[in-house]
UniProtKB/Swiss-Prot annotation:
Species classification: Bacteria, Bacillati, Cyanobacteriota, Cyanophyceae, Oscillatoriophycideae
Biological role stated in the UniProt entry: Catalyzes the folate-dependent formation of 5-methyl-uridine at position 54 (M-5-U54) in all tRNAs.
Its EC number(s): 2.1.1.74
GO molecular function, one term: flavin adenine dinucleotide binding
Amino acids binding FAD: G10, G11, G12, L13, A14, G15
Source taxon at top rank: Bacteria
UniProt name for this protein: Methylenetetrahydrofolate--tRNA-(uracil-5-)-methyltransferase TrmFO
Length: 445
């Protein structure tokens, strides 16, 4: 019997899942949640796993990225997904829940578990010893964020998420977009989408008129962050040529189709993953509504059929530079007994938060039992997501949702997208079952 408890800090989806996995392994766990002693600007109740935005966990079909992640978690006995299934409400092809009942039941389950102690208190410092799981989310309290920054390093904690859209590489028209670096310096590292004057002016006008998302009050108060990383629509509003002398400058780039004529403007895309399946729109951090982003950005030559795996966002979001700090087991490299999960590590979405909680909780339990920590196969959605956030380029790291672009390709080309995604799902679930069967213990811990 292990007497020393594991501490889980933060009672959101990730923390709830982590605490459950630890307790189910027979290890005492203290789950710290500051509400209702201290609330955040986005929360409205004292319940664990409160859903502060939508009540939807995303698409259910396994040929959708979130649906595949749901199914992986079901097979791994996730408490969060089991409760989402139990308290689901009709939502077409999505897994949506009665949010009040969902959060209340999860709170009761954890509070009634004999090995779980629920402590309502604000934690202002990371415990310096023992096994600890950080799951404090995007609205981590100022005091704890300051301590985390001291631990991680000044440059490895972000407080505002200003991210450009990310596009699936196969949806980019390579007959228009060309690989090159400015002035041909170094390796051809960017995909470039050239515009003539007419195309640029049309794009500029549509961008100026596009509808923006509403900022929450606490985000509006932090608008000073925008000056350091201006939205592309703000640049457009400052004049016809502002973008052309900023991120859309054409200097040093020649369109191979018209080598003697410099483009009027160029949108650059930077590779987001080692396999070149994901591409980031350089300088296109934006606060446009998602539908408007799709409409306006598909006006760019070469991106007419672009598939966005992540939309641009600008909002308050505390997250660490995971590639610099974490391994794919979600342990801190500098302190393996400290783990983290949820939006704090740069994953996006409810289901990804639960997945991170599952892995961090499982590995925390394994550490307590003297077992080696585990990582999932990278052919699974869970495994590929945590491999991505722990191995992406640290300099440009931004949060990432589950998507098929981070999975390894098949050796043979499958042109039909739905068929390809279905085969990704089949491979993932087969590899997950094989991985589970290889573990020597009766359960994962």
């Amino acid at each position: 019997m292990i007497d020393r408890p594991i501490h889980v800090i933060g009672g959101g989806l990730a923390g709830t899942e982590a605490a459950w996995q630890i307790a189910q392994a027979g290890i005492p766990v203290i789950l710290h949640e500051m509400r209702p002693i201290r609330s955040s600007p986005a929360h409205h109740s004292q319940f664990l796993a409160e859903l502060v935005c939508s009540n939807s966990f995303g698409a259910m079909a396994v040929d959708r990225a979130t649906g595949l992640l749901h199914e992986e978690l079901r097979r791994l006995n996730s408490l969060v997904i089991a409760q989402a299934d139990q308290h689901s409400v009709p939502a077409g092809g999505a897994l949506a829940v009665d949010r009040g009942v969902f959060s209340r039941n999860l709170t009761e389950i954890l509070a009634n578990h004999p090995l779980v102690t629920l402590k309502r208190q604000e934690i202002t410092e990371i415990p310096r010893d023992g096994i600890v799981v950080l799951t404090t989310g995007p609205l981590t309290s100022a005091a704890l964020a300051a301590d985390l920054q001291n631990f991680a390093g000044l440059d490895y904690l972000s407080f505002f998420d200003a991210a450009s859209p990310i596009i699936l590489g196969e949806s980019i028209d390579r007959s228009i977009a060309f690989l090159a670096s400015r002035y041909d310096k170094g390796e051809a590292a960017y995909l470039n989408c050239p515009m003539d004057r007419e195309q640029y002016l049309h794009f500029w006008q549509e961008l100026k008129q596009a509808e923006q998302a509403e900022l929450k009050d606490f985000e509006r108060e932090n608008a000073k962050f925008f000056e350091a990383c201006l939205p592309i629509e703000e640049l457009a509003s400052r004049g016809e040529d502002t973008m052309r002398f900023g991120p859309l400058k054409p200097v040093g780039l020649a369109d191979p189709r018209y080598p003697d004529q410099r483009p009027y403007a160029v949108i650059q895309l930077r590779m987001e993953d080692k396999a070149g399946q994901l591409w980031n729109m350089v300088g296109f951090q934006t606060n446009l509504k998602w539908g408007e982003q799709t409409r306006v950005f598909r006006l760019i030559p070469g991106l007419e059929k672009a598939e966005f795996v992540r939309m641009g966002v600008m909002h308050k979001n505390t997250f660490i530079n995971s590639p610099q700090l974490l391994s794919s087991s979600l342990q801190f490299k500098s302190r393996p007994t400290l783990l983290a999960a949820g939006q704090l590590i740069g994953t996006e979405g409810y289901t990804a938060a639960a997945a991170g909680g599952w892995l961090a909780g499982t590995n925390a339990a394994r550490l307590a039992l003297g077992l080696e920590t585990v990582t999932l196969p990278t052919t699974t959605m869970m495994g590929s997501l945590f491999e991505f956030i722990s191995s992406a380029e640290p300099k440009h790291f931004q949060p990432m949702p589950p998507n098929f672009g981070i999975l390894p390709n098949f050796t043979r080309k499958i042109r039909n997208k739905r068929e390809r995604y279905g085969q990704y799902a089949d491979r993932s679930l087969q590899d997950l079952e094989a991985w589970m069967n290889q573990l020597k213990t009766p359960c994962l811990v």
